[in-house]
From Swiss-Prot:
InterPro entries: Kinetochore_Nuf2_N, Nuf2_DHR10-like, Nuf2_N_sf. Signal peptide: none annotated. Residues 51-80, 128-186, 316-426 form a coiled coil. The keyword Transcription regulation does not apply. Component of the NDC80 complex, which consists of ndc80, nuf2, spc24 and spc25. Can self-associate. Component of the NMS super complex which consists of mis12, mis13, mis14, ndc80, nnf1, nuf2, sos7, spc7, spc24 and spc25. One of its GO terms (molecular function) is kinetochore adaptor activity. This is Kinetochore protein nuf2.
Length: 441
């Protein structure tokens, strides 16, 4: 027994026109002589158009079964066909075509294909008519998705900045630690150099004092030698003729000369020592200048250290601010996700309510069709009776006239009843649409 469907069957020309309007390539020959190779791509286009399931999405669903299925490469095509059939069957159930079978894919029949395409086209028309009722929800959903995408991109950007700041912070801390260690070493070296400088200055002052004393003594010796030479010249003028006295004076003079010579040798030695110490002092003075230059470099490094410390503090504040912004963005993201979830739940609830009301309306239409069928059968019976009475018109003309009037009155009452039922149905559908609009708003 053929299953009854709630949608009207469309004509061949109308089906081809609607499919062409959807932008799907499908010829009249493929509709009249359908094959599996022709209908499977057509159904794939329907899934892509109405469910957003592309061939790539289908491959991803099949590939997700790779870990749970043995010999995946061998049965890949069979798995793909099975998954495709399951999704397509679910789609057919949703558009009220409940007797879709695998034969419709493998060995499609012309009449069933025409019926299936009628179901899809009627669903597309109904979807297009009802789509305006959900425009606000769709726009809100798209707006929320765009906001979520933007916030997610900002969150990733901030995370990258935080990671970069943390890396810079670690590098700055390592550089600061190295600078602190180097500054500590240089500070200790400066303290030692300062101590050595003070010792060298003390030694230098002592040597200068000794040099000045030696210069004074040297001048004294020179003056003494000059006076001695003068005395010798005086003595030469007054030569002593007594040998004993002469020998005594000679001995005294020799002794004085030897003493002067020894003093001169000592003075020469001290002068050489002083020259050596002066050279050492000059070298020490060069070392002191180098130490002063190192000290200036240390001061520059200390300034750099202070600048790096200020920069580190600024980066730390920036990192803290970024963390605060990150937490705010995460909180905002959770709020948006909750709003999106609530909107989706509301949309699903509205769709479920709409489906229930549509099912009720379809059931009512089925009942009306059954009643109309019964009325039509009764009308056919009356017509048959009328034909029999027309055959006997010569015998019972008056009786036939009366029955004809009675039949016409019954037909008019039936027509009026049908019109009433039709007006009730239209009123019910209008009330249903108004309730749907009020529930959506």
């Amino acid at each position: 027994m053929a299953r009854k469907h709630t949608f009207p069957s469309l004509k061949r020309a109308e089906i081809l026109e609607c499919i062409d309007g959807l932008g799907i390539p499908f010829t009249a020959k493929e509709l009249d002589q359908p094959t599996s190779k022709a209908v499977i791509p057509l159904y794939e286009e329907f899934l892509d158009l109405f469910m957003g399931l592309t061939r790539q999405n289908l491959e991803e669903k099949v590939n997700s079964l790779q870990d749970s299925v043995e010999n995946f490469e061998i049965i890949h095509e069979s798995l793909r066909f099975t998954v495709f059939y399951q999704i397509l069957s679910q789609f057919m159930q949703n558009i009220c075509f409940h007797d879709f079978t695998i034969q419709d894919l493998l060995k499609p029949d012309r009449n069933r294909l025409q019926l299936i395409l009628s179901a899809v086209i009627n669903f597309a028309k109904l979807r297009e008519e009802r789509l305006q009722q959900f425009d606000d929800d769709i726009q809100k959903r798209e707006s929320l998705l765009e906001t979520y995408t933007l916030l997610d991109a900002q969150r990733k950007d901030l995370e990258e900045k935080v990671l970069l700041s943390q890396d810079r912070k670690l590098e700055s801390e390592a550089i600061i630690k190295q600078n602190e260690e180097r500054n500590e070493e240089m500070f200790q070296s400066l303290i030692e150099d300062k101590r050595l400088c003070s010792q060298v200055r003390t030694e230098y002052d002592r040597i200068r004092m000794e040099a000045s004393e030696l210069k004074i003594r040297y001048h004294n010796v020179d003056s003494l030698m000059a006076s001695t030479l003068e005395e010798i010249e005086k003595l030469q003028s007054s030569i002593v003729h007594s040998p004993e006295k002469l020998k005594g004076k000679i001995a005294d003079t020799s002794l004085r000369i030897q003493n002067d010579r020894s003093q001169q040798v000592e003075l020469d030695k001290k002068s050489k020592i002083l020259h050596t110490k002066l050279n050492s002092l000059q070298l020490i003075e060069g070392d002191l200048n180098a130490c002063l230059k190192v000290l200036e470099e240390c001061l520059v490094e200390l300034d750099k250290l202070e600048h790096a410390t200020v920069l580190l503090s600024t980066n730390q504040e920036l990192c803290d601010q970024i963390e605060i912004n990150k937490k705010k963005l995460e909180f905002r993201k959770e709020q948006l996700l909750k709003q999106l979830s609530n909107a989706q739940e509301k949309l699903e609830h509205e769709q479920h309510s709409r489906n229930q009301k549509l099912e009720a309306a379809k059931q009512r239409m089925d009942n009306i069709r059954e009643e109309y069928k019964v009325i039509t059968q009764e009308r056919n019976k009356k017509i048959q009776e009328t034909e029999k009475k027309n055959a006997m018109i010569e015998m019972t003309e008056q009786k036939i006239a009366g029955m004809r009037e009675e039949l016409e009155s019954q037909i008019s009452s039936i027509t009026m009843e049908f019109e009433k039922l039709k007006s009730h149905v239209e009123l019910y559908i209008a009330e249903l649409l108004r309730n749907l609009r009020s529930s959506n708003s």
